[in-house]
Amino acid sequence: GREAELASRLASIFLEKLLELGAEAGETLKMLNRMLITKDEEVFTTVDLLEIDRMTGDARIIKAGAAPTFIYRQGECYRLDARTAPVGIISEVRAAETKLKLKRGDIVMTSDGITPTDPKPSLPPTGESKTAAALAGAIINRWSESAATGDDMSVSVIRIA
């Protein structure tokens, strides 16, 4: 609902601003958690954070209560799940962290509000010329039938060039 949207937007802005200033991701999550817990009402949000070193391809995915992340590489699908609570639920953040090396042609996809029924779903046919935005739209069209009625849906796609 409206409260979830506001919590998500607040968390996004908070994380973005602090990370842009050079704050460490783990500490930033702890600060966000403390801020959400001190509210009078129950406020929580999921976090799905991707850090990429664009020179080396080294990447870190940090997840707290978030839906699966899918990495597509040379026709293979790798699913990253994290069985962690959202930020703002418990006093200590227990985010899951995965480190990996991204390569040219990799596609990283996360979603909210939709999860494919297949544990390792294939991507909609796109061809190499499709943009990440076009691929995100095709994914929403394909997977939206599995979404809960009335839930908002979003997909983020990053194609490594």
What does each of the following model-derived ranges do?
Residues 1-6, 113-117:
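Short acidic, Gly/Ser-rich segments with clustered Asp/Glu that frequently serve as metal-coordination loops
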Residues 3-75, 81, 144-151:
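Catalytic core of PPM/PP2C metal-dependent serine/threonine phosphatase domains
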Residues 33-34, 94-97, 140-142:
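Glycine-rich, charged/polar anion/phosphate-binding loops
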Residues 42-47, 80-121, 148-149:
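Acidic loop->beta-strand submotif enriched in PP2C/PPM serine/threonine phosphatases
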Residues 52, 95, 160:
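Hydrophobic pocket-lining residues within nucleotide cofactor-binding pockets
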